[in-house]
């Protein structure tokens, strides 16, 4: 469960993500494809090469959706219900992949936020991304 302190840390550090959504998102996706190559199966129509426009665009969408979740932490489920439906019913993404991408996004944050990615910030993002993954997986039940 996200505490008030967690929410404050997320909102403060998210300010540093703004303006870098496409870069951070693309980097997280590329890390996921390298580390967990089985995830590529969900993107058969994408050019999966480094710097691909499709990866950059999708990365931006992912990080922008996370930004909306940061803004709407109190009612994340209702704010992101459409995404949950899309991933469960249309794309049929195995929910374990949400955790894989979350791990890669946390690495990207650590690399770019450097000293500002403290253990408390790491804990807050871990809890937040887990909550987002749980919300996306709601429709699978």
Swiss-Prot record:
<dbReference type="GO" id="GO:0046872">
    <property type="term" value="F:metal ion binding"/>
</dbReference>
<feature type="binding site" description="distal binding residue">
    <location>
        <position position="58"/>
    </location>
    <ligand>
        <name>heme b</name>
    </ligand>
</feature>
<dbReference type="GO" id="GO:0042744">
    <property type="term" value="P:hydrogen peroxide catabolic process"/>
</dbReference>
<keyword id="KW-0408">Iron</keyword>
<dbReference type="Pfam" id="PF00042">
    <property type="entry name" value="Globin"/>
</dbReference>
<keyword id="KW-0561">Oxygen transport</keyword>
<keyword id="KW-0813">Transport</keyword>
<dbReference type="GO" id="GO:0043177">
    <property type="term" value="F:organic acid binding"/>
</dbReference>
<keyword id="KW-0349">Heme</keyword>
<dbReference type="GO" id="GO:0005833">
    <property type="term" value="C:hemoglobin complex"/>
</dbReference>
<dbReference type="InterPro" id="IPR012292">
    <property type="entry name" value="Globin/Proto"/>
</dbReference>
<comment type="similarity">
    <text>Belongs to the globin family.</text>
</comment>
<dbReference type="InterPro" id="IPR002338">
    <property type="entry name" value="Hemoglobin_a-typ"/>
</dbReference>
<dbReference type="GO" id="GO:0031838">
    <property type="term" value="C:haptoglobin-hemoglobin complex"/>
</dbReference>
<dbReference type="InterPro" id="IPR000971">
    <property type="entry name" value="Globin"/>
</dbReference>
<feature type="domain" description="Globin">
    <location>
        <begin position="1"/>
        <end position="141"/>
    </location>
</feature>
<comment type="function">
    <text>Involved in oxygen transport from the lung to the various peripheral tissues.</text>
</comment>
<dbReference type="GO" id="GO:0019825">
    <property type="term" value="F:oxygen binding"/>
</dbReference>
<dbReference type="InterPro" id="IPR009050">
    <property type="entry name" value="Globin-like_sf"/>
</dbReference>
<dbReference type="GO" id="GO:0005344">
    <property type="term" value="F:oxygen carrier activity"/>
</dbReference>
<feature type="binding site" description="proximal binding residue">
    <location>
        <position position="87"/>
    </location>
    <ligand>
        <name>heme b</name>
    </ligand>
</feature>
<protein>
    <recommendedName>
        <fullName>Hemoglobin subunit alpha-D</fullName>
    </recommendedName>
</protein>
<dbReference type="GO" id="GO:0004601">
    <property type="term" value="F:peroxidase activity"/>
</dbReference>
<comment type="subunit">
    <text>There are three forms of hemoglobin in Sphenodon: A, A' and D. Hb A is a tetramer of two alpha-A and two beta-1, Hb A' is a tetramer of two alpha-a and two beta-2, Hb D is a tetramer of two alpha-D and two beta-2.</text>
</comment>
<dbReference type="GO" id="GO:0072562">
    <property type="term" value="C:blood microparticle"/>
</dbReference>
<keyword id="KW-0479">Metal-binding</keyword>
<dbReference type="InterPro" id="IPR050056">
    <property type="entry name" value="Hemoglobin_oxygen_transport"/>
</dbReference>
<dbReference type="GO" id="GO:0020037">
    <property type="term" value="F:heme binding"/>
</dbReference>
<dbReference type="GO" id="GO:0031720">
    <property type="term" value="F:haptoglobin binding"/>
</dbReference>
């Amino acid at each position: 469960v996200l505490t008030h302190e967690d929410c404050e840390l997320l909102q403060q550090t998210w300010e540093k993500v703004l303006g870098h959504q496409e870069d951070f998102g693309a980097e997280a996706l590329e890390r996921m494809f390298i580390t967990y190559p089985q995830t590529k199966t969900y993107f058969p129509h994408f050019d999966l090469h480094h710097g691909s426009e499709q990866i950059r665009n999708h990365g931006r969408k992912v990080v922008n959706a996370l930004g909306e979740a940061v803004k709407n932490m109190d009612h994340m489920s209702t704010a992101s219900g459409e995404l949950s439906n899309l991933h469960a019913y249309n794309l049929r993404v195995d929910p374990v992949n949400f955790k894989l991408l979350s791990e890669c996004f946390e690495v990207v944050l650590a690399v770019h936020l450097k000293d500002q990615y403290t253990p408390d910030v790491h804990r807050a993002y871990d809890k937040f991304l887990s909550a987002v993954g749980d919300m996306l997986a709601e429709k699978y039940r």
